[in-house]
Amino acid sequence: EPSINIANQSFSSNKVDVNLVTPDNWQKIEPKSSMRDSEYIIRNSKGEFNLIVFKNIGGSVDQNINRWINQFSGDQNEKMPLISKEIERNGIKFTFLQNSGSFNGGMGQSEEFDNAALIGFIVQNSQNTYYYKAVAEVDVLHESKENIIDTILKSSI
């Protein structure tokens, strides 16, 4: 069974708001939509992709996770099988989602394509809920998977 090691991260403080401390390969850009809180281009040796951040958008965590899952169809890629996992640290709840297959398009990401993958996080603190979502070709996203997980977990707590 696929697993992801997010439970053993160390957490130091209880921030009320998220301020991403990003690696050098993350470039903050002007969000392409007013619905987006922020947006980053992440580059690696396989290519580049956008990580989109929403803040306090509608729907429950489960509704958003299910919507993201349903944006994919067909066979999953063994590098990025469906994983949905929740952890809580210092009063902050993290919901991690990974999925792959054929991307059917979604809000602000209407281009359909095959061999796609998604990494998503929903981070809930006492005041806000942040939604992090990246969709890209499997090999491109897989190369940055641990980098994304580490950055979001370490910056959110």
For each of these PLM feature ranges, what is it?
Residues 45, 56-58, 100-104, 127, ...:
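Solvent-exposed coil/turn segments that connect beta secondary-structure elements
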Residues 17, 58-63, 113, 139-146:
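Soluble non-cytosolic domains of exported or imported proteins
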Residues 1-14:
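Sec-dependent signal peptide cleavage junction
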Residues 26, 127-157:
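Surface-exposed amphipathic alpha-helical segments
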Residues 19-75:
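Secretory pathway targeting signatures of secreted, lumenal, and periplasmic proteins
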Residues 32, 66-123:
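Signature of long, low-cysteine stretches enriched in small and polar/charged residues
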Residues 50-58, 108, 134-142:
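Second-shell loop/turn segments in exported
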Residues 23, 62-69, 119-120, 145-153:
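Extracytoplasmic/secreted envelope proteins and their assembly/folding machinery
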